[in-house]
UniProtKB/Swiss-Prot annotation:
Homohexamer. Residues 204-213 are annotated as: Important for the catalytic mechanism of both phosphorylation and dephosphorylation. It catalyses: [HPr protein]-L-serine + ATP = [HPr protein]-O-phospho-L-serine + ADP + H(+); [HPr protein]-O-phospho-L-serine + phosphate + H(+) = [HPr protein]-L-serine + diphosphate. Both phosphorylation and phosphorolysis are carried out by the same active site and suggest a common mechanism for both reactions. Gene3D superfamilies: HprK N-terminal domain-like, P-loop containing nucleotide triphosphate hydrolases. The keyword Methyltransferase does not apply. Keywords: ATP-binding, Carbohydrate metabolism, Kinase, Magnesium, Metal-binding, Multifunctional enzyme, Nucleotide-binding, Serine/threonine-protein kinase, Transferase. It comes from Lactobacillus delbrueckii subsp. bulgaricus (strain ATCC 11842 / DSM 20081 / BCRC 10696 / JCM 1002 / NBRC 13953 / NCIMB 11778 / NCTC 12712 / WDCM 00102 / Lb 14). Its EC number is 2.7.11.-, 2.7.4.-. This is HPr kinase/phosphorylase. It holds the Pfam family Hpr_kinase_N. Residues 267-272 are annotated as: Important for the catalytic mechanism of dephosphorylation.
């Protein structure tokens, strides 16, 4: 199913936009493409490959060029620009809208929006907004928290202690984004973002207590609507026979929305302070990203020590 954004929602979410003409047509319009188009060649009469299903943005360049056209040509061009599938026309900088454009838009049932903002700003702002709104979303089982400003997805089998660990992290001053189910989407080629489903927003389930409202119990500083997922921490029940990473050389990843995210596995055992371990895991991940790798330093020091001992044995 293709995601859509109703034009009414688009206008309400962006206070810098207002309807100049065609208010009665707004409710029936939907946006299905995140790209915004500036009709340039179309003003000269070239309409091959014209993407009529996009938001059409007209700035100072387009309006001034159209003003140089004769009346009949200007009318024909605007009639072709305004198609039934066109969600809306948007004019920047509060520029005067040509009469021919108003007539063509009215005939096609295309609303005209206007904004005081610059064209390039509107292009960037709208593209980013629509990219998020129209992104394909999927769900993963886990708890998403923000620790030291970094999005951490806690995963593991049911009952392993994900929610309890997240609650302890919130009490340490960190933030909850989503509990139990995390909706994820790809923001760009390198970024995956997680958020809570609307029905679960700010809520957490703690076994033995039930559903709690983190916002009301801990305040606005304890929650966040969404965050980029930078690290996955997989919590597993302690297995004495398992071969856990003791030095930190293993680098594993988990694919989320087609993006590889670093994953570490932490065994859960009675007596282990999981929130502190998660905090250390995040700090260690950030340190590695900055070029400080304790495991690598240890390996280099060990190799150097072995080499020195070998030289001493040869001399002895």
């Amino acid at each position: 199913m293709t995601n859509t954004v109703k034009l009414t929602e688009f206008i309400n979410d962006n206070s810098n936009l207002r309807v100049l003409q065609g208010q009665e047509c707004v409710a029936g319009k939907e946006i299905t493409v995140s790209d915004v188009y500036r009709p340039g060649l179309e003003l000269s009469g070239y309409f091959d490959f014209y993407p009529a299903d996009r938001v059409q943005l007209l700035g100072r360049t387009e309006i001034s060029y159209a003003a140089r056209l004769d009346h009949d040509l200007r009318r024909k061009v605007f009639e072709k620009i305004c198609q039934k599938e066109t969600p809306c026309l948007l004019v920047s900088r509060n520029l005067p809208v040509p009469v021919e454009l108003k007539e063509a838009a009215e005939a096609a049932g295309t609303p005209i929006l206007i904004s005081n903002d610059a064209t390039t700003y509107l292009m960037s702002m709208i593209t980013q907004y629509l990219a998020v709104k129209l992104a394909e979303r999927s769900s993963v089982h886990g708890v998403l928290v923000e620790v030291f400003g970094m999005g951490v997805l806690l995963t593991g089998e049911s009952g392993v202690g994900k929610s309890e660990t997240a609650l302890a992290l919130v009490q340490h001053g960190h933030r909850l984004i989503a509990d139990d189910r995390v909706d994820v989407y790809q923001r760009d080629h390198e970024t995956v973002v997680g958020e809570a489903p609307r029905i679960l927003k700010h809520l957490m389930e703690i076994r033995g207590i039930g559903i709690i409202d983190v916002l009301k119990l801990f305040g606005i500083g304890a929650i966040k609507d969404e965050t980029e997922i930078s690290l996955v921490i997989n919590l597993t029940n302690w297995d004495s026979k398992a071969n856990y990473d003791r030095l930190g050389f293993q680098e594993n990843t988990r694919i989320i929305c087609g993006i590889a995210v670093t994953q570490v596995t932490i065994p859960v055992k009675v007596g282990r302070n999981m929130e502190n371990i998660v905090e250390v895991a995040v700090m260690n991940f950030r340190a590695k990203a900055m070029g400080f790798d304790a495991a690598k330093t240890f390996d280099e020091n060990l190799t150097s020590l072995i080499a020195e001992n070998s030289e001493e044995e040869k001399r002895g």
